[in-house]
């Protein structure tokens, strides 16, 4: 997928929600509003995709349930939680032909525990590692064709910082154990 940089900004923070705006430097910044409950935080869409997929697919998320990140009580080694999304996706464009599909993304997230991680933004001794396994089920328009794709990735979170590293070992059927897609925090500012 190559190397890309982006800026992520948090705003409109309340007890029940906050907005994350992602600016990749090209085009309009992308914003979504997360909800916060006693169970944890839920992103309205699956936004953990690695960079480089811009322009390939248009996705409209129509359902989100479960928890993206759990409450502090659940964010403990050995705990797990689920997240589920349903989306309508369009691949291609009107000129060359479009393929419409419904995607269901079902994920199980497992808190592996704390470990040290080094990224350009610094060295963190107590990053919480979360391993995610998931299945993307795609129903291809009116064709009746359905396919499933396994997805596996690990994320490292640091208290008072957030996500500092994410590594996709398997994405859309492409094994990446020898060359995973990696996102790392370059820098951050306390607000």
Task: Locate the predicted segments by residue.
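Conserved functional acidic sites
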Residues: 1-191
